[in-house]
Design a protein with these regions (language model features):
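Sec-dependent N-terminal signal peptides
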Residues: 10-18
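Formylglycine-dependent sulfatase
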Residues: 3-6, 18, 23-487, 495-530
Length: 530
Protein backbone atom coordinates (compact mmCIF):
# COMPACT_ATOMS: atom_id res chain seq x y z
CA UNK A 1 0.00 0.00 0.00
CA UNK A 2 3.01 2.30 0.25
CA UNK A 3 3.00 3.17 -3.44
CA UNK A 4 -0.73 3.73 -3.48
CA UNK A 5 -0.41 6.06 -0.53
CA UNK A 6 2.25 8.10 -2.30
CA UNK A 7 0.04 8.42 -5.37
CA UNK A 8 -2.86 9.54 -3.22
CA UNK A 9 -0.82 12.33 -1.74
CA UNK A 10 0.69 13.38 -5.03
CA UNK A 11 -2.08 15.87 -5.73
CA UNK A 12 -1.99 17.75 -2.43
CA UNK A 13 -2.29 21.45 -2.99
CA UNK A 14 -2.73 21.19 -6.75
CA UNK A 15 -6.37 22.26 -6.90
CA UNK A 16 -6.68 25.88 -7.89
CA UNK A 17 -9.69 28.12 -7.65
CA UNK A 18 -9.69 31.35 -9.59
CA UNK A 19 -12.40 33.92 -9.01
CA UNK A 20 -13.26 36.92 -11.10
CA UNK A 21 -12.85 40.25 -9.38
CA UNK A 22 -15.66 40.97 -6.95
CA UNK A 23 -17.10 37.46 -7.13
CA UNK A 24 -15.83 35.89 -3.91
CA UNK A 25 -18.42 34.28 -1.66
CA UNK A 26 -18.91 36.20 1.55
CA UNK A 27 -18.31 34.38 4.83
CA UNK A 28 -21.85 35.18 5.97
CA UNK A 29 -23.31 33.55 2.87
CA UNK A 30 -22.71 29.93 3.90
CA UNK A 31 -25.29 27.49 2.57
CA UNK A 32 -27.61 26.38 5.31
CA UNK A 33 -30.71 24.23 5.48
CA UNK A 34 -32.67 26.88 7.34
CA UNK A 35 -35.39 28.65 5.41
CA UNK A 36 -37.14 27.62 2.23
CA UNK A 37 -35.72 24.63 0.38
CA UNK A 38 -34.47 25.48 -3.11
CA UNK A 39 -35.96 24.07 -6.27
CA UNK A 40 -33.48 22.18 -8.46
CA UNK A 41 -33.43 22.13 -12.27
CA UNK A 42 -30.82 19.95 -13.99
CA UNK A 43 -30.51 20.66 -17.73
CA UNK A 44 -28.41 17.97 -19.41
CA UNK A 45 -27.44 18.62 -23.02
CA UNK A 46 -26.75 15.61 -25.22
CA UNK A 47 -23.30 15.35 -26.88
CA UNK A 48 -22.44 19.03 -26.33
CA UNK A 49 -18.71 19.64 -26.08
CA UNK A 50 -16.94 21.88 -23.60
CA UNK A 51 -15.90 24.19 -26.45
CA UNK A 52 -19.45 24.47 -27.79
CA UNK A 53 -20.16 26.87 -24.93
CA UNK A 54 -18.83 30.11 -26.37
CA UNK A 55 -17.67 31.34 -22.96
CA UNK A 56 -15.30 28.36 -22.72
CA UNK A 57 -13.78 28.65 -26.18
CA UNK A 58 -11.97 31.83 -27.29
CA UNK A 59 -12.24 30.71 -30.92
CA UNK A 60 -15.78 29.30 -30.78
CA UNK A 61 -17.90 29.56 -33.88
CA UNK A 62 -20.94 28.87 -31.74
CA UNK A 63 -22.90 31.49 -29.82
CA UNK A 64 -24.47 30.53 -26.50
CA UNK A 65 -25.54 33.79 -24.80
CA UNK A 66 -28.00 32.16 -22.39
CA UNK A 67 -25.50 29.54 -21.19
CA UNK A 68 -22.79 32.19 -20.94
CA UNK A 69 -25.15 34.34 -18.85
CA UNK A 70 -25.87 31.39 -16.58
CA UNK A 71 -22.12 30.94 -16.04
CA UNK A 72 -21.61 34.64 -15.32
CA UNK A 73 -24.36 34.48 -12.72
CA UNK A 74 -23.08 31.36 -11.01
CA UNK A 75 -20.11 29.02 -10.81
CA UNK A 76 -18.40 27.60 -13.90
CA UNK A 77 -16.39 24.39 -13.45
CA UNK A 78 -13.58 24.18 -15.99
CA UNK A 79 -12.43 20.63 -15.20
CA UNK A 80 -15.73 18.75 -15.02
CA UNK A 81 -16.10 15.25 -16.43
CA UNK A 82 -18.86 12.81 -17.20
CA UNK A 83 -18.79 9.31 -15.74
CA UNK A 84 -18.65 7.86 -19.24
CA UNK A 85 -17.79 9.03 -22.73
CA UNK A 86 -21.20 8.05 -24.13
CA UNK A 87 -24.83 8.55 -23.14
CA UNK A 88 -25.95 5.68 -20.91
CA UNK A 89 -22.91 5.41 -18.58
CA UNK A 90 -22.96 9.14 -17.95
CA UNK A 91 -26.68 9.24 -17.14
CA UNK A 92 -26.37 6.23 -14.86
CA UNK A 93 -23.58 7.95 -12.92
CA UNK A 94 -25.52 11.20 -12.57
CA UNK A 95 -28.69 9.54 -11.29
CA UNK A 96 -27.07 6.99 -8.96
CA UNK A 97 -23.73 8.46 -7.88
CA UNK A 98 -22.04 5.26 -9.10
CA UNK A 99 -19.69 4.55 -11.97
CA UNK A 100 -21.30 2.58 -14.78
CA UNK A 101 -18.59 -0.08 -14.85
CA UNK A 102 -20.14 -1.36 -11.61
CA UNK A 103 -23.26 -2.48 -13.51
CA UNK A 104 -22.92 -6.30 -13.81
CA UNK A 105 -24.94 -6.76 -17.00
CA UNK A 106 -24.89 -4.35 -19.90
CA UNK A 107 -26.96 -4.67 -23.07
CA UNK A 108 -27.24 -2.50 -26.16
CA UNK A 109 -30.72 -2.83 -27.63
CA UNK A 110 -31.06 0.90 -28.09
CA UNK A 111 -34.35 2.03 -26.59
CA UNK A 112 -35.46 -1.54 -26.01
CA UNK A 113 -32.80 -2.49 -23.46
CA UNK A 114 -33.85 -3.76 -20.04
CA UNK A 115 -33.63 -1.43 -17.03
CA UNK A 116 -30.06 -0.80 -15.91
CA UNK A 117 -30.93 0.75 -12.54
CA UNK A 118 -32.08 -1.82 -10.01
CA UNK A 119 -35.49 -1.10 -8.38
CA UNK A 120 -33.89 -0.85 -4.95
CA UNK A 121 -31.13 1.50 -6.10
CA UNK A 122 -31.28 5.02 -4.67
CA UNK A 123 -31.42 7.78 -7.29
CA UNK A 124 -31.43 11.55 -7.07
CA UNK A 125 -35.20 11.20 -7.46
CA UNK A 126 -35.70 9.03 -4.37
CA UNK A 127 -33.12 11.11 -2.51
CA UNK A 128 -35.05 14.33 -3.08
CA UNK A 129 -38.43 12.70 -2.44
CA UNK A 130 -37.20 11.79 1.05
CA UNK A 131 -36.48 15.47 1.61
CA UNK A 132 -40.01 16.49 0.66
CA UNK A 133 -39.51 17.28 -3.02
CA UNK A 134 -41.82 16.70 -5.95
CA UNK A 135 -39.73 15.17 -8.74
CA UNK A 136 -39.90 14.90 -12.52
CA UNK A 137 -37.86 13.41 -15.35
CA UNK A 138 -38.65 15.03 -18.69
CA UNK A 139 -36.56 14.19 -21.76
CA UNK A 140 -34.19 11.50 -22.95
CA UNK A 141 -34.04 8.46 -20.65
CA UNK A 142 -31.68 5.86 -22.21
CA UNK A 143 -31.39 3.71 -19.09
CA UNK A 144 -33.65 0.86 -20.08
CA UNK A 145 -37.33 -0.02 -19.71
CA UNK A 146 -39.49 -3.13 -19.28
CA UNK A 147 -41.58 -3.25 -22.44
CA UNK A 148 -44.57 -5.52 -22.91
CA UNK A 149 -44.54 -8.18 -25.63
CA UNK A 150 -47.25 -9.07 -28.12
CA UNK A 151 -46.33 -12.76 -28.03
CA UNK A 152 -44.88 -13.88 -24.71
CA UNK A 153 -43.51 -17.05 -26.31
CA UNK A 154 -41.17 -15.02 -28.52
CA UNK A 155 -38.27 -12.68 -27.71
CA UNK A 156 -38.97 -8.99 -27.86
CA UNK A 157 -36.26 -8.44 -30.47
CA UNK A 158 -35.16 -10.90 -33.14
CA UNK A 159 -32.32 -8.74 -34.47
CA UNK A 160 -30.05 -6.70 -32.21
CA UNK A 161 -29.79 -4.03 -34.92
CA UNK A 162 -33.55 -3.38 -34.58
CA UNK A 163 -34.12 -2.32 -38.19
CA UNK A 164 -37.79 -3.24 -38.46
CA UNK A 165 -40.83 -4.21 -36.45
CA UNK A 166 -40.31 -5.93 -33.10
CA UNK A 167 -42.44 -8.00 -30.74
CA UNK A 168 -43.06 -4.93 -28.56
CA UNK A 169 -46.59 -4.25 -27.33
CA UNK A 170 -46.77 -0.46 -27.37
CA UNK A 171 -50.30 -0.46 -25.91
CA UNK A 172 -49.21 -2.01 -22.60
CA UNK A 173 -47.77 -0.22 -19.58
CA UNK A 174 -44.01 0.20 -19.45
CA UNK A 175 -42.16 -0.25 -16.15
CA UNK A 176 -38.61 0.03 -14.85
CA UNK A 177 -38.34 3.70 -15.80
CA UNK A 178 -38.36 7.03 -13.99
CA UNK A 179 -41.66 6.49 -12.15
CA UNK A 180 -40.27 3.39 -10.42
CA UNK A 181 -36.99 5.13 -9.65
CA UNK A 182 -38.00 8.21 -7.68
CA UNK A 183 -39.70 10.49 -10.19
CA UNK A 184 -43.33 11.42 -9.54
CA UNK A 185 -43.86 12.56 -13.11
CA UNK A 186 -42.18 11.49 -16.32
CA UNK A 187 -42.33 12.38 -20.00
CA UNK A 188 -39.55 10.55 -21.80
CA UNK A 189 -38.01 9.46 -25.06
CA UNK A 190 -36.72 5.89 -24.49
CA UNK A 191 -33.20 6.49 -25.86
CA UNK A 192 -31.29 8.79 -28.22
CA UNK A 193 -33.09 10.56 -31.04
CA UNK A 194 -31.30 8.37 -33.61
CA UNK A 195 -32.37 5.09 -31.96
CA UNK A 196 -35.73 3.31 -32.10
CA UNK A 197 -38.33 3.23 -30.79
CA UNK A 198 -39.21 6.82 -31.61
CA UNK A 199 -42.08 7.51 -29.24
CA UNK A 200 -42.94 9.47 -26.11
CA UNK A 201 -44.05 7.91 -22.84
CA UNK A 202 -45.92 9.77 -20.12
CA UNK A 203 -45.82 8.08 -16.72
CA UNK A 204 -45.12 4.69 -18.26
CA UNK A 205 -47.68 4.80 -21.06
CA UNK A 206 -46.89 5.26 -24.75
CA UNK A 207 -48.73 8.40 -25.84
CA UNK A 208 -49.25 7.25 -29.44
CA UNK A 209 -49.20 3.42 -29.79
CA UNK A 210 -49.89 3.61 -33.55
CA UNK A 211 -46.55 2.36 -34.89
CA UNK A 212 -44.95 2.71 -38.32
CA UNK A 213 -41.35 2.43 -39.51
CA UNK A 214 -39.13 5.46 -40.05
CA UNK A 215 -38.68 4.31 -43.64
CA UNK A 216 -42.41 4.84 -44.11
CA UNK A 217 -42.42 8.26 -42.42
CA UNK A 218 -39.22 9.82 -43.83
CA UNK A 219 -37.55 9.73 -47.22
CA UNK A 220 -34.04 8.31 -47.58
CA UNK A 221 -31.16 10.25 -49.11
CA UNK A 222 -28.42 7.70 -49.65
CA UNK A 223 -26.60 9.44 -52.49
CA UNK A 224 -24.98 12.09 -50.30
CA UNK A 225 -21.32 11.96 -49.35
CA UNK A 226 -21.20 10.23 -46.00
CA UNK A 227 -18.55 11.43 -43.59
CA UNK A 228 -16.34 8.80 -42.00
CA UNK A 229 -17.86 9.14 -38.54
CA UNK A 230 -21.38 8.76 -39.90
CA UNK A 231 -20.41 5.82 -42.10
CA UNK A 232 -19.71 3.73 -39.02
CA UNK A 233 -23.27 4.25 -37.85
CA UNK A 234 -25.36 4.10 -41.00
CA UNK A 235 -26.53 1.48 -43.46
CA UNK A 236 -28.95 1.21 -46.37
CA UNK A 237 -31.95 1.01 -44.04
CA UNK A 238 -31.27 4.24 -42.18
CA UNK A 239 -32.36 7.76 -43.01
CA UNK A 240 -29.39 9.87 -44.10
CA UNK A 241 -29.75 13.48 -45.21
CA UNK A 242 -26.42 15.10 -44.41
CA UNK A 243 -23.50 15.06 -41.98
CA UNK A 244 -25.08 14.47 -38.59
CA UNK A 245 -28.61 14.45 -40.00
CA UNK A 246 -29.34 10.73 -39.85
CA UNK A 247 -31.17 8.24 -37.70
CA UNK A 248 -31.61 4.50 -37.62
CA UNK A 249 -34.59 2.79 -39.15
CA UNK A 250 -37.05 1.31 -36.70
CA UNK A 251 -40.39 1.65 -34.98
CA UNK A 252 -41.90 5.12 -34.63
CA UNK A 253 -45.20 6.49 -33.37
CA UNK A 254 -47.19 7.72 -36.34
CA UNK A 255 -47.50 11.23 -34.86
CA UNK A 256 -43.82 11.45 -33.85
CA UNK A 257 -41.74 14.08 -35.63
CA UNK A 258 -37.98 13.92 -35.20
CA UNK A 259 -37.63 17.62 -35.94
CA UNK A 260 -40.14 18.53 -33.18
CA UNK A 261 -38.79 16.26 -30.45
CA UNK A 262 -36.70 18.79 -28.54
CA UNK A 263 -39.49 21.38 -28.70
CA UNK A 264 -41.98 18.92 -27.22
CA UNK A 265 -39.61 18.05 -24.38
CA UNK A 266 -39.03 21.71 -23.57
CA UNK A 267 -42.76 22.49 -23.63
CA UNK A 268 -43.32 19.69 -21.12
CA UNK A 269 -40.50 21.02 -18.95
CA UNK A 270 -41.82 24.58 -19.00
CA UNK A 271 -45.34 23.37 -18.19
CA UNK A 272 -43.98 21.40 -15.24
CA UNK A 273 -42.13 24.44 -13.90
CA UNK A 274 -45.29 26.56 -14.25
CA UNK A 275 -47.37 23.94 -12.46
CA UNK A 276 -45.00 23.16 -9.62
CA UNK A 277 -43.59 26.67 -9.29
CA UNK A 278 -46.92 27.85 -7.92
CA UNK A 279 -46.91 25.25 -5.14
CA UNK A 280 -45.23 25.53 -1.77
CA UNK A 281 -43.53 22.16 -2.15
CA UNK A 282 -40.01 22.33 -3.66
CA UNK A 283 -39.39 20.46 -6.91
CA UNK A 284 -36.58 18.66 -8.71
CA UNK A 285 -36.73 18.73 -12.50
CA UNK A 286 -34.28 16.51 -14.36
CA UNK A 287 -34.41 17.79 -17.95
CA UNK A 288 -32.17 15.68 -20.23
CA UNK A 289 -32.33 17.14 -23.74
CA UNK A 290 -32.05 15.37 -27.10
CA UNK A 291 -29.75 17.98 -28.62
CA UNK A 292 -27.25 18.52 -30.02
CA UNK A 293 -27.05 14.72 -30.42
CA UNK A 294 -27.73 13.36 -33.91
CA UNK A 295 -29.89 13.88 -35.85
CA UNK A 296 -28.93 17.53 -36.03
CA UNK A 297 -32.40 18.82 -36.84
CA UNK A 298 -32.98 22.31 -35.44
CA UNK A 299 -36.46 23.72 -35.77
CA UNK A 300 -37.33 26.39 -38.33
CA UNK A 301 -36.61 29.22 -35.86
CA UNK A 302 -32.92 28.28 -35.72
CA UNK A 303 -32.29 26.50 -39.03
CA UNK A 304 -29.70 28.38 -41.09
CA UNK A 305 -28.98 30.98 -38.40
CA UNK A 306 -25.32 30.15 -37.65
CA UNK A 307 -21.98 29.75 -39.42
CA UNK A 308 -21.63 26.17 -38.22
CA UNK A 309 -24.24 24.41 -40.31
CA UNK A 310 -26.99 22.31 -38.80
CA UNK A 311 -24.81 21.51 -35.77
CA UNK A 312 -24.35 25.16 -34.90
CA UNK A 313 -28.05 25.79 -35.46
CA UNK A 314 -28.89 22.96 -33.06
CA UNK A 315 -26.48 24.39 -30.47
CA UNK A 316 -28.36 27.70 -30.77
CA UNK A 317 -31.62 25.89 -30.11
CA UNK A 318 -30.16 24.18 -27.02
CA UNK A 319 -29.02 27.57 -25.77
CA UNK A 320 -32.56 28.83 -26.26
CA UNK A 321 -33.80 26.02 -24.01
CA UNK A 322 -31.63 27.40 -21.20
CA UNK A 323 -33.00 30.86 -21.89
CA UNK A 324 -36.61 29.69 -21.79
CA UNK A 325 -36.12 27.83 -18.51
CA UNK A 326 -34.36 30.69 -16.74
CA UNK A 327 -36.85 33.27 -18.04
CA UNK A 328 -39.77 31.16 -16.83
CA UNK A 329 -38.23 30.80 -13.37
CA UNK A 330 -37.88 34.58 -13.18
CA UNK A 331 -41.44 35.15 -14.43
CA UNK A 332 -42.73 32.96 -11.61
CA UNK A 333 -40.58 34.76 -9.05
CA UNK A 334 -38.78 31.59 -8.00
CA UNK A 335 -35.43 32.13 -9.71
CA UNK A 336 -33.65 33.41 -6.58
CA UNK A 337 -34.13 30.15 -4.73
CA UNK A 338 -33.81 27.74 -7.63
CA UNK A 339 -30.57 25.90 -8.32
CA UNK A 340 -30.01 25.58 -12.06
CA UNK A 341 -27.37 23.07 -13.15
CA UNK A 342 -26.33 22.93 -16.80
CA UNK A 343 -24.06 20.26 -18.21
CA UNK A 344 -23.61 17.66 -20.96
CA UNK A 345 -23.48 13.88 -20.86
CA UNK A 346 -20.14 13.59 -22.71
CA UNK A 347 -17.94 15.29 -25.25
CA UNK A 348 -19.07 16.11 -28.77
CA UNK A 349 -18.74 13.66 -31.70
CA UNK A 350 -16.61 16.21 -33.51
CA UNK A 351 -13.96 14.54 -35.65
CA UNK A 352 -10.84 16.00 -37.27
CA UNK A 353 -12.67 16.45 -40.57
CA UNK A 354 -15.28 18.58 -38.80
CA UNK A 355 -12.58 20.78 -37.28
CA UNK A 356 -10.99 21.22 -40.70
CA UNK A 357 -14.29 21.96 -42.44
CA UNK A 358 -15.78 24.35 -39.91
CA UNK A 359 -12.77 25.74 -38.05
CA UNK A 360 -14.47 24.99 -34.74
CA UNK A 361 -13.26 22.79 -31.88
CA UNK A 362 -16.25 21.44 -29.98
CA UNK A 363 -13.97 19.77 -27.45
CA UNK A 364 -11.75 22.82 -27.08
CA UNK A 365 -8.34 22.24 -25.52
CA UNK A 366 -8.67 18.46 -25.34
CA UNK A 367 -7.76 15.51 -27.52
CA UNK A 368 -10.39 13.21 -28.99
CA UNK A 369 -14.16 13.22 -29.12
CA UNK A 370 -17.24 11.50 -27.77
CA UNK A 371 -16.56 7.87 -26.90
CA UNK A 372 -12.84 8.32 -26.28
CA UNK A 373 -10.84 7.75 -23.11
CA UNK A 374 -8.95 10.90 -24.06
CA UNK A 375 -10.33 14.01 -22.41
CA UNK A 376 -12.36 15.08 -25.44
CA UNK A 377 -14.67 12.16 -24.72
CA UNK A 378 -15.65 13.17 -21.21
CA UNK A 379 -14.54 16.76 -20.50
CA UNK A 380 -17.82 18.68 -20.26
CA UNK A 381 -19.29 22.06 -19.41
CA UNK A 382 -20.73 22.29 -15.88
CA UNK A 383 -22.41 25.42 -14.55
CA UNK A 384 -24.27 25.89 -11.26
CA UNK A 385 -26.39 28.94 -10.48
CA UNK A 386 -28.14 29.65 -7.16
CA UNK A 387 -28.82 33.39 -6.77
CA UNK A 388 -29.94 33.12 -3.15
CA UNK A 389 -26.64 31.60 -2.05
CA UNK A 390 -23.93 31.88 -4.71
CA UNK A 391 -22.17 35.06 -5.73
CA UNK A 392 -21.74 35.65 -9.44
CA UNK A 393 -18.89 34.88 -11.80
CA UNK A 394 -16.85 32.22 -10.00
CA UNK A 395 -14.63 29.86 -12.00
CA UNK A 396 -13.60 26.65 -10.30
CA UNK A 397 -10.71 24.63 -11.72
CA UNK A 398 -10.73 21.61 -9.47
CA UNK A 399 -11.79 18.25 -10.87
CA UNK A 400 -15.45 17.30 -10.36
CA UNK A 401 -17.81 14.91 -12.11
CA UNK A 402 -21.47 14.48 -12.95
CA UNK A 403 -21.31 11.56 -10.54
CA UNK A 404 -20.84 14.14 -7.75
CA UNK A 405 -24.24 15.76 -8.18
CA UNK A 406 -25.83 13.01 -6.08
CA UNK A 407 -23.69 13.62 -3.00
CA UNK A 408 -23.99 17.38 -3.45
CA UNK A 409 -27.80 17.18 -3.39
CA UNK A 410 -27.63 14.91 -0.35
CA UNK A 411 -25.37 17.44 1.36
CA UNK A 412 -27.68 20.28 0.42
CA UNK A 413 -30.71 18.52 1.91
CA UNK A 414 -28.86 17.36 5.04
CA UNK A 415 -28.95 13.65 4.24
CA UNK A 416 -26.21 11.28 5.35
CA UNK A 417 -25.30 8.78 2.64
CA UNK A 418 -24.86 5.13 3.52
CA UNK A 419 -21.68 3.25 2.66
CA UNK A 420 -23.42 1.32 -0.13
CA UNK A 421 -25.16 4.40 -1.53
CA UNK A 422 -23.73 6.67 -4.25
CA UNK A 423 -20.45 4.80 -3.89
CA UNK A 424 -18.44 7.09 -6.16
CA UNK A 425 -20.00 10.48 -5.44
CA UNK A 426 -18.22 13.35 -3.68
CA UNK A 427 -20.09 16.48 -2.62
CA UNK A 428 -18.87 19.79 -4.04
CA UNK A 429 -21.03 21.73 -1.59
CA UNK A 430 -17.77 23.07 -0.16
CA UNK A 431 -17.29 24.99 -3.41
CA UNK A 432 -20.78 26.44 -3.24
CA UNK A 433 -19.96 27.41 0.34
CA UNK A 434 -16.89 29.31 -0.82
CA UNK A 435 -14.41 26.84 0.69
CA UNK A 436 -11.37 27.26 -1.54
CA UNK A 437 -8.97 25.17 0.50
CA UNK A 438 -10.36 21.64 0.48
CA UNK A 439 -10.63 19.88 -2.90
CA UNK A 440 -13.80 17.95 -3.65
CA UNK A 441 -11.91 14.85 -4.82
CA UNK A 442 -8.32 13.93 -5.63
CA UNK A 443 -9.06 11.44 -8.39
CA UNK A 444 -11.70 10.61 -10.98
CA UNK A 445 -12.34 7.59 -13.23
CA UNK A 446 -13.56 7.62 -16.83
CA UNK A 447 -15.14 4.90 -18.98
CA UNK A 448 -14.80 4.91 -22.77
CA UNK A 449 -17.34 3.58 -25.26
CA UNK A 450 -15.23 0.45 -25.77
CA UNK A 451 -15.19 -0.22 -22.03
CA UNK A 452 -11.65 1.05 -21.44
CA UNK A 453 -10.92 2.76 -18.13
CA UNK A 454 -8.83 5.78 -17.28
CA UNK A 455 -7.99 7.44 -13.99
CA UNK A 456 -6.81 10.97 -13.30
CA UNK A 457 -5.06 11.87 -10.05
CA UNK A 458 -3.41 15.22 -9.65
CA UNK A 459 -1.74 16.07 -12.96
CA UNK A 460 -1.40 12.42 -13.97
CA UNK A 461 -3.80 10.50 -16.18
CA UNK A 462 -3.50 6.78 -16.89
CA UNK A 463 -5.45 4.92 -19.63
CA UNK A 464 -5.56 1.12 -19.62
CA UNK A 465 -5.14 0.70 -23.39
CA UNK A 466 -3.24 2.04 -26.39
CA UNK A 467 -5.51 4.06 -28.66
CA UNK A 468 -8.57 6.22 -28.12
CA UNK A 469 -10.67 3.49 -26.54
CA UNK A 470 -13.59 5.00 -28.40
CA UNK A 471 -14.74 6.58 -31.66
CA UNK A 472 -11.44 8.06 -32.82
CA UNK A 473 -9.37 5.70 -34.97
CA UNK A 474 -7.59 3.62 -33.83
CA UNK A 475 -9.74 2.63 -30.88
CA UNK A 476 -7.17 0.13 -29.64
CA UNK A 477 -3.73 -0.96 -30.80
CA UNK A 478 -1.87 -4.13 -29.95
CA UNK A 479 1.19 -3.54 -27.81
CA UNK A 480 4.57 -4.35 -29.30
CA UNK A 481 7.55 -5.95 -27.59
CA UNK A 482 9.09 -3.56 -25.07
CA UNK A 483 6.44 -0.98 -25.97
CA UNK A 484 3.82 0.65 -23.76
CA UNK A 485 0.75 -1.32 -22.73
CA UNK A 486 -1.13 1.77 -21.64
CA UNK A 487 -0.96 5.55 -21.69
CA UNK A 488 0.27 8.05 -19.11
CA UNK A 489 0.06 11.81 -19.49
CA UNK A 490 1.01 14.77 -17.34
CA UNK A 491 -2.00 16.97 -18.02
CA UNK A 492 -0.40 19.96 -16.32
CA UNK A 493 2.10 20.14 -19.20
CA UNK A 494 0.24 18.20 -21.87
CA UNK A 495 -3.50 18.87 -21.93
CA UNK A 496 -3.71 17.47 -25.47
CA UNK A 497 -2.37 14.08 -24.31
CA UNK A 498 0.25 14.00 -27.04
CA UNK A 499 3.30 12.74 -25.09
CA UNK A 500 2.83 9.25 -23.68
CA UNK A 501 5.10 8.93 -20.64
CA UNK A 502 4.19 5.32 -19.91
CA UNK A 503 7.72 3.99 -20.45
CA UNK A 504 9.68 6.86 -18.92
CA UNK A 505 7.38 7.09 -15.86
CA UNK A 506 6.55 3.43 -15.53
CA UNK A 507 6.43 3.59 -11.73
CA UNK A 508 3.67 6.20 -11.77
CA UNK A 509 1.82 4.29 -14.48
CA UNK A 510 1.98 1.07 -12.47
CA UNK A 511 0.80 2.77 -9.29
CA UNK A 512 -2.16 4.38 -11.04
CA UNK A 513 -3.00 1.08 -12.70
CA UNK A 514 -3.05 -0.63 -9.30
CA UNK A 515 -5.11 2.18 -7.77
CA UNK A 516 -7.61 1.90 -10.60
CA UNK A 517 -7.92 -1.84 -10.01
CA UNK A 518 -8.42 -1.24 -6.30
CA UNK A 519 -11.27 1.19 -6.91
CA UNK A 520 -12.90 -1.17 -9.40
CA UNK A 521 -12.60 -4.30 -7.27
CA UNK A 522 -13.61 -2.89 -3.90
CA UNK A 523 -16.95 -1.59 -5.19
CA UNK A 524 -16.62 2.04 -4.16
CA UNK A 525 -14.23 4.97 -4.33
CA UNK A 526 -15.70 7.77 -2.24
CA UNK A 527 -14.10 6.83 1.09
CA UNK A 528 -10.75 5.39 0.05
CA UNK A 529 -8.97 8.74 -0.02
CA UNK A 530 -10.46 10.18 3.14
Amino acid sequence: MGKLYSIRNMATGLAVLSLNAGSSVASDNQLKLSGEKPNVVIILADDMGYGDVSLNNPFARTSTPAIDKLANEGICFTDAHSGGAVCTPSRYSLLTGRYFFRVPKKTSYWGYLAPLIEPERETIGTLMQKSGYTTACIGKWHLGLNWGRKDMSKPQIENAKVLGYTNTDFSSSVTGGPNELGFDYSFILPASLDMPPYTFLRNGKVIDPNIVLTAEAYRHALDRTVYAWDRKHTNDNDVYWDRGVWWRNGEMSKSFKVENCLDEIVEEGISYIEREGKNKKPFLLYLPLTGPHTPWMPNSQFSGTTELGTYGDFIAQVDNVVSRVTVKLKELGIDKNTIVIFSSDNGAPWATEDILQYGHQSNWGRRGQKGDAWDGGHHIPLIVKWPAKIKQGATYRETVGLVDIFATLADMTGQQLRTNQAEDSFSFMNVLNGDLQNPTRDHIIYLSSAGKLAIKKGPWKYIDCIGSGGFTYPSELLSVKNGPTGQLYNLADDSLESNNLFLSKRGIANDLSELLKEFVNCGYSKNLTK
